[in-house]
Amino acid sequence: MRHYEIVFIVHPDQSEQVSAMIERYRNIVTARNGQVHRLEDWGRRQLAYLIQKVHKAHYVLMNIECDQETLDELEHAFKFNDAILRHLTLKMDEPVTAPSPMMREEKAKSAPQPAEEAKETTLAT
């Protein structure tokens, strides 16, 4: 089986349906003895250019391990789902399980680093 990284963009009007879509696509992979190594919901983000007169869309990243038949079924599901504006599939050499740079940035913004807090405390005294 091969490893793939898939990013798909969902129409913002369908954002509440994203969790159901993710579950459906995860089931397609696991039903055929595949694995989902990483699954990240990046949320609603600004698009670089208009797609179908839409400025924002909901992004989802999946790293999976599956055979060609399963990948074909997934891509077929993406093509015939009107809520999915775009999708991209990349073949990877090995499974990727570490958080993506997008998620690392968000975690860094949401929680200050303990080392920085220690510095601030030391400087204050």
Swiss-Prot record:
Pfam families: Ribosomal_S6 (PF01250). Residues 116-125 have a biased composition (Basic and acidic residues). GO terms for cellular component: cytosolic small ribosomal subunit. Keywords: Ribonucleoprotein, Ribosomal protein, RNA-binding, rRNA-binding. GO terms for molecular function: small ribosomal subunit rRNA binding; structural constituent of ribosome. GO terms for biological process: translation. Residues 96-125 are annotated as: Disordered. The keyword RNA-binding applies. It comes from the Bacteria. Disulfide bonds: none annotated. The keyword rRNA-binding applies. Binds together with bS18 to 16S ribosomal RNA. PANTHER family: MITOCHONDRIAL 28S RIBOSOMAL PROTEIN S6, SMALL RIBOSOMAL SUBUNIT PROTEIN BS6M. HAMAP family: Ribosomal_bS6. Belongs to the bacterial ribosomal protein bS6 family. This is Small ribosomal subunit protein bS6. It comes from Nitrosospira multiformis (strain ATCC 25196 / NCIMB 11849 / C 71). The gene is rpsF.
